[in-house]
Amino acid sequence: MGISFSNNNRRRDNNNRRHLHHYPPPPPYYYLDPPPPPPPFPPHYDYNYSNYHLSPPLPPQPQINSCSYGHYHYHPQPPQYFTTAQPNWWGPMMRPAYYCPPQPQTQPPKPYLEQQNAKKVRNDVNVHRDTVRLEVDDLVPGHHLVSFVFDALFDGSFTITFFAKEEPNCTIIPQFPEVYSPTRFHFQKGPGQKFLQPSGTGTDLSFFVLDDLSKPLEEDVYPLVISAETIISPNSISEQSSVHKQVTQAVLEKDNDGSFKVKVVKQILWIEGVRYELRELYGSTTQGAASGLDESGSGTECVICMTEAKDTAVLPCRHLCMCSDCAKELRLQSNKCPICRQPIEELLEIKMNSSDEQH
């Protein structure tokens, strides 16, 4: 009996071929050297640059995808940025920007106060503002007469007007002439005279509204205006006569008993074409009201140094309270009145001798 090896071998080869798998050849690989690592950072020293300005933040960088080279995975590094406080090894050394430290804030200087000297002006006629009254006319019921005390260096005249306003060149214009026409009265020179409006020339205040009598109306229309005027004769034929005028503007307030009280608001001087507005100075006496000083010498010391006579007034509060030396020091240190603590806008120095005849 013979054994055939050819069939067995063929069967074995077929079984072997059945279990073999054919794979495609591997693709070619490209082996590249990895990129060198970046140089190490230099040692960093923590300096306190609190006063230095740091560089602005970096702009956003575009996204960079990683690449695979063979068996090595390489992630590209973003470019290195250095602030001004770090050295750049790929370029020149960048120094930090030095700035001067902020200076301490200083207080603003005190406002400069202007100091002026008072100008002496002779007033030929003066109506004492605290003596102006309204008296009832006994002969004409319901009518009131104007009275006051005045001083005059020359002869002149008074003009009494109800509800009048001041126009250019100190001209007084009545607003209701049909109700009360202005009345003019002459006077002679002399000090301390009392004027009383003649009976029958008064006015009936019932024609006016009480609210209109107690305050100035629009465009500075005052309920009561007293104009005192003197005319100085020229010394020669070529000279013109000079008109000096004092205007007293007042309001009328009614008391509970029905009587009227006069409150003077403003007094104006018109001398040789120049307009002056009279203001009372607080701290002066009646005798020294014109010059701003008390002739008796009492109560005239400066409120700051308490030794020198006070000769400087504070505007607009009109407190006569300092000497000229203290006023010069005060205007460099403060702008507050030492009496009422209101802001000072101007200082008025008044230098008058007791022997001066002009007031």
Swiss-Prot record:
<keyword id="KW-0862">Zinc</keyword>
<comment type="pathway">
    <text>Protein modification; protein ubiquitination.</text>
</comment>
<feature type="region of interest" description="Disordered">
    <location>
        <begin position="1"/>
        <end position="35"/>
    </location>
</feature>
<keyword id="KW-0808">Transferase</keyword>
<dbReference type="InterPro" id="IPR045194">
    <property type="entry name" value="MGRN1/RNF157-like"/>
</dbReference>
<dbReference type="GO" id="GO:0061630">
    <property type="term" value="F:ubiquitin protein ligase activity"/>
</dbReference>
<dbReference type="GO" id="GO:0008270">
    <property type="term" value="F:zinc ion binding"/>
</dbReference>
<keyword id="KW-0863">Zinc-finger</keyword>
<keyword id="KW-0833">Ubl conjugation pathway</keyword>
<feature type="lipid moiety-binding region" description="N-myristoyl glycine">
    <location>
        <position position="2"/>
    </location>
</feature>
<comment type="function">
    <text>Acts as an E3 ubiquitin-protein ligase, or as part of E3 complex, which accepts ubiquitin from specific E2 ubiquitin-conjugating enzymes and then transfers it to substrates (in vitro).</text>
</comment>
<comment type="similarity">
    <text>Belongs to the RING-type zinc finger family. LOG2 subfamily.</text>
</comment>
<dbReference type="GO" id="GO:0004842">
    <property type="term" value="F:ubiquitin-protein transferase activity"/>
</dbReference>
<protein>
    <recommendedName>
        <fullName>Probable E3 ubiquitin-protein ligase LUL4</fullName>
        <ecNumber>2.3.2.27</ecNumber>
    </recommendedName>
</protein>
<feature type="compositionally biased region" description="Pro residues">
    <location>
        <begin position="23"/>
        <end position="35"/>
    </location>
</feature>
<keyword id="KW-0479">Metal-binding</keyword>
<dbReference type="GO" id="GO:0016567">
    <property type="term" value="P:protein ubiquitination"/>
</dbReference>
<dbReference type="InterPro" id="IPR013083">
    <property type="entry name" value="Znf_RING/FYVE/PHD"/>
</dbReference>
<dbReference type="Pfam" id="PF13920">
    <property type="entry name" value="zf-C3HC4_3"/>
</dbReference>
<keyword id="KW-0519">Myristate</keyword>
<dbReference type="InterPro" id="IPR001841">
    <property type="entry name" value="Znf_RING"/>
</dbReference>
<dbReference type="InterPro" id="IPR045195">
    <property type="entry name" value="LOG2-like_mRING_C3HC5"/>
</dbReference>
<keyword id="KW-0449">Lipoprotein</keyword>
<feature type="region of interest" description="DAR2 domain">
    <location>
        <begin position="148"/>
        <end position="267"/>
    </location>
</feature>
<feature type="zinc finger region" description="RING-type">
    <location>
        <begin position="302"/>
        <end position="341"/>
    </location>
</feature>
